Amino acid sequence: PLAIDKYLGRISGPLLDRIDLHIEVPPVPYEDLAGSAEGTSSAALRRLVEVARTVQARRFGPGAGLLNGRMTPRQIRQYCRLDSHGQAVLKHAVETLGLSARAHDRILRVARTIADLQEAEPIRAEHVAEAIAYRALDRRLWTR
């Protein structure tokens, strides 16, 4: 843990701001690897992604080829509408974690995608909370 913290301390905030997802993945216990438990099938995941891409194609227009991850700051403000609870969660995270404008926009892009997977409009608090959870290094560096 100390070596990890030392290494992470060498990564600049502006570099982390350019990475959409920071996820810590714990080791998988051998029992889980050797067991017969099945997760979500690739076919089911593919259907979810196809739904989200269809939602995005409707949003941006046919033939635009634009995906949420490529939205400009202007498009983020246009298409990433949050309900009041979502606004409150995002505001609290920005103030508590000291997030930059770039991190704020990346959270909105990811939250928009999470909402699209559920065909939800507007973006709700749970979508924002999940997107914030994917910013593990922001939280880890801020709470050191």
Could you describe each region identified by the protein language model?
Residues 1-144:
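Basic, amphipathic alpha-helical bundle interface domains used for macromolecular binding and assembly
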